[in-house]
C-alpha cells in the first residue's frame, strides 16, 4: 500500500469503530431509561393512577332518637333562658309574636313562635290580638335570641308543632280558612305531605313540640268545636310522610294544645287542654308508637292545672272524667309523671292568666283527688301576666330532663293603652340540685312602648 491508501484504510477503520461505539452508547442509554421507568411503575401504587376528580363524601353516623334513657330525678326547676323581646322591642325591629315554644335537636335548643307579619313599632301591629291570619308564620331562632328581622320564617302557620327525629326537623304547619285549613308537613326543609281539614272547624295542633322515636314522629291534631264535641286524631309521620292516623280513644272528652314528652319506649305521653268540660287538665294521653294504640284519661291531682278553675279547696279530679268545674275556656299547660307523683305548672290566679307556679303533687298521677303539694316555686309573681306554657325534653348523657317555658303576654286584651298583643318567654329546666327564689316577669314598662 502506498502511504495514501494506508491513511484511508486507518481512517475508515477508526470511523467504523467510532460508529459502533456510538450505537452501543445509545443502546446502553435506552436500556437504562427502560429499566428506570419499569422500576418506578412497580413502586407506584395503583391508586396513584389518573382517575376522574370526584368529591369525597364523609358520612356522619347520624341516628334516629330513641329516648331510651330514664327520666332525670329532680328536686325542682332552675332558670335557663329569657329572651326579653318586648323590652327590646321598645327600640324597634322585633317581631310581634304569640304562642311560643321550645324544642331541641341533639345538640342545641331553639325557640319558636307564631309571628304576626310585623314588628311591634309598626302600624301593622294594630289588631294583632287575632289568632288566625294568612300573615302568620312560624319563626325559629336559637334559644335566647329574640325574633329580630333576620329571623327565619319556617312556614306559613297559625297553628303548628315541631320536633327533631335525630336527623332533621319536622314542622307541622296549619294555615288557611277556618272552615277548610291545610296542615303542611315539612321535613328537612322540604314539603313532603299535607292533610286538609276533616271537620271544617279550625284544624289545629299542639302549639309545642311533637315527639319522634326511632324515626317516627307523632302529633296530636283536633278539628271541631272549641267548646263542644270535636274530632281529635293522632298522626304518625316518618320523614315528613303520614304513615298512620289513629282516632282518639279513652275517657277524654275534649283535647286541645297537648304538651307531649317521650316516656318509656315505645310510649309518648301528653297532657292537654280540655276547653269544654274540665279544668282538671286532661289528659293522660298515652300514645304507643309501636302499634299506634291510644288511651286517654285525666290527671288525678285534685289540685287542677287549667285556668279558670275552682279554688283548691273545692277543685277535684277522679282520674277518668272531666270535673265539670269551669271547663271553658282554658289555657295551654303541662304536667308530667314521676312514679305515682306529678310535677305540674299553672297560673297563680285561678281566674286569669297572671302569675305562674310549679309544684309536685304526691300521688297526683295515680290517686284520685290527691292534694298533697310539695316543692312549690314561683316563676312569675301574681302581679304580672303569664300565658301559655308547655314542656320540652332534653337528653343528657345519663337521663332525660324535663324543661318548660312560660309565655309572658303583654298588650291587649289586658293592657288597652296599646293596640298590639305580643309576648316574651322565660324557660326553666329540671335540676337535682338546690335552688333559690325569685320572679321572672316580662318586665317591659308599657308606658315606654310604641302604641
UniProtKB/Swiss-Prot annotation:
User: What Enzyme Commission number does this protein have?
Assistant: 3.2.1.18
Q: How does it sit in the membrane?
A: Single-pass type II membrane protein
Topology Intravirion: residue spans: 1-6
Q: Where are the transmembrane segments?
A: 7-29
The UniProt entry, under CDD domains, shows: Influenza_NA (cd15483)
Q: Which domain of life is it from?
A: Viruses
Any one GO CC term of this protein is:
membrane
**Catalytic reactions on record:** Hydrolysis of alpha-(2->3)-, alpha-(2->6)-, alpha-(2->8)- glycosidic linkages of terminal sialic acid residues in oligosaccharides, glycoproteins, glycolipids, colominic acid and synthetic substrates
What does this chain do?
A: Catalyzes the removal of terminal sialic acid residues from viral and cellular glycoconjugates. Cleaves off the terminal sialic acids on the glycosylated HA during virus budding to facilitate virus release. Additionally helps virus spread through the circulation by further removing sialic acids from the cell surface. These cleavages prevent self-aggregation and ensure the efficient spread of the progeny virus from cell to cell. Otherwise, infection would be limited to one round of replication.
Q: What is this protein called?
A: Neuraminidase
The record lists the organism as: Influenza A virus (strain A/Chicken/Pennsylvania/8125/1983 H5N2)
Amino acid at each position: 500500500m502506498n502511504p495514501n491508501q494506508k491513511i484511508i484504510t486507518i481512517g475508515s477503520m477508526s470511523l467504523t469503530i467510532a460508529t459502533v461505539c456510538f450505537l452501543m452508547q445509545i443502546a446502553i442509554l435506552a436500556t437504562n431509561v427502560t429499566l428506570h421507568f419499569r422500576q418506578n411503575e412497580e413502586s407506584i401504587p395503583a391508586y396513584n393512577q389518573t382517575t376522574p376528580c370526584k368529591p369525597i363524601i364523609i358520612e356522619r353516623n347520624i341516628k334516629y332518637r330513641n329516648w331510651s334513657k330514664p327520666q332525670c330525678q329532680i328536686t325542682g326547676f332552675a332558670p335557663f333562658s329569657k329572651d326579653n323581646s318586648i323590652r327590646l322591642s321598645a327600640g324597634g325591629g322585633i317581631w310581634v309574636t304569640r304562642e311560643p315554644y321550645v324544642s331541641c335537636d341533639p345538640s342545641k335548643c331553639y325557640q319558636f313562635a307564631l309571628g304576626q307579619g310585623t314588628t311591634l313599632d309598626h302600624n301593622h301591629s294594630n289588631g294583632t290580638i287575632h289568632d288566625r291570619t294568612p300573615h302568620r308564620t312560624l319563626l325559629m331562632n336559637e334559644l335566647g335570641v329574640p325574633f329580630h328581622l333576620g329571623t327565619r320564617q319556617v312556614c306559613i302557620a297559625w297553628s303548628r308543632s315541631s320536633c327533631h327525629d335525630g336527623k332533621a326537623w319536622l314542622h307541622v304547619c296549619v294555615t288557611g280558612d277556618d272552615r277548610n285549613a291545610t296542615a303542611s308537613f315539612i321535613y328537612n326543609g322540604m314539603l313532603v305531605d299535607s292533610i286538609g281539614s276533616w271537620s271544617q272547624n279550625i284544624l289545629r295542633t299542639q302549639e309545642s313540640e311533637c315527639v319522634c322515636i326511632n324515626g317516627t314522629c307523632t302529633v296530636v291534631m283536633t278539628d271541631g268545636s272549641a267548646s263542644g264535641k270535636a274530632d281529635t286524631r293522632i298522626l304518625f309521620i316518618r320523614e315528613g310522610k303520614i304513615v298512620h292516623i289513629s282516632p282518639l280513644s279513652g275517657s277524654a272528652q275534649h283535647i286541645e294544645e297537648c304538651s307531649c314528652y317521650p316516656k318509656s319506649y315505645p310510649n309518648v305521653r301528653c297532657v292537654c287542654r280540655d276547653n269544654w268540660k274540665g279544668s282538671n287538665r286532661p289528659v293522660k294521653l298515652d300514645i304507643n308508637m309501636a302499634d299506634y294504640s291510644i288511651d286517654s284519661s285525666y290527671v288525678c291531682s285534685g289540685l287542677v292545672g287549667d285556668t279558670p278553675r275552682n279554688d283548691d279547696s273545692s277543685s277535684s279530679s277522679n282520674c277518668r272524667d272531666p270535673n265539670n268545674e269551669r271547663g271553658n275556656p282554658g289555657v295551654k299547660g303541662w304536667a308530667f309523671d314521676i312514679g305515682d307523683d306529678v310535677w305540674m305548672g299553672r297560673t297563680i290566679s285561678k281566674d286569669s292568666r297572671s302569675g305562674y307556679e310549679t309544684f309536685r303533687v304526691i300521688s297526683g298521677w295515680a290517686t284520685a283527688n290527691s292534694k298533697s303539694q310539695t316543692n312549690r316555686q314561683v316563676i312569675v309573681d301574681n302581679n304580672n301576666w303569664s300565658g301559655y306554657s308547655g314542656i320540652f325534653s332534653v337528653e343528657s348523657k345519663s337521663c332525660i330532663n324535663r324543661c318548660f317555658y312560660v309565655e309572658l303576654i303583654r298588650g291587649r286584651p289586658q293592657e288597652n293603652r296599646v293596640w298590639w298583643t305580643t309576648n316574651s318567654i322565660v324557660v326553666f329546666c329540671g335540676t337535682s340540685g338546690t335552688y333559690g327564689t325569685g320572679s321572672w316577669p316580662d318586665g317591659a314598662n308599657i308606658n315606654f312602648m310604641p302604641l
